[in-house]
């Protein structure tokens, strides 16, 4: 039971930091294009390149997400959401392509009682205690 987009929830970052290794020549070519004004900086160049590649594979991504029954975008689980599930004797299997966020006031016990499994392709934001409690249920 995810919270609709218009309800209040904590602000989450719009991106996740990653580290990549590039060959010296590739990096030099990026720097050359940046210095010639093709892009504002390395990050802008790499983001654009990634978006272009994802755009070329959009159909494949959409079909795979549908086949794996992944929810696309942001899914936020508040304490009230999970308490309602618990009180109804229900659990949830979370399948997200994007960001799954569990409220900071959710206890590890409540998460264990209500989240049967969690699959996130992207990022999972939850307290360290909740992540540890759900450890074996995170795929």
What are these regions (language model features)?
Residues 5-11, 28-32, 40-64:
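Short, basic amphipathic alpha-helical segments that act as recognition/interaction helices
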């Amino acid at each position: 039971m995810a919270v609709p987009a218009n309800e209040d929830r904590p602000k989450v970052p719009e991106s996740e930091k990653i580290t990549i290794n590039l060959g010296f020549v590739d990096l030099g070519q990026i720097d050359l294009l940046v210095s010639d004004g093709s892009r504002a900086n390395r990050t802008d160049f790499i983001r654009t390149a990634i978006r272009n590649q994802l755009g070329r594979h959009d159909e494949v991504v959409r079909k795979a997400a549908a086949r794996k029954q992944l929810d696309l975008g942001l899914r936020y689980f508040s304490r009230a959401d999970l308490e309602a599930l618990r009180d109804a004797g229900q659990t949830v299997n979370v399948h997200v392509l994007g960001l799954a966020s569990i409220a900071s006031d959710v206890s590890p016990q409540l998460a264990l009682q209500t989240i049967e499994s969690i699959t996130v392709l992207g990022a999972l934001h939850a307290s360290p205690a909740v992540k540890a409690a759900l450890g074996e249920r995170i795929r």
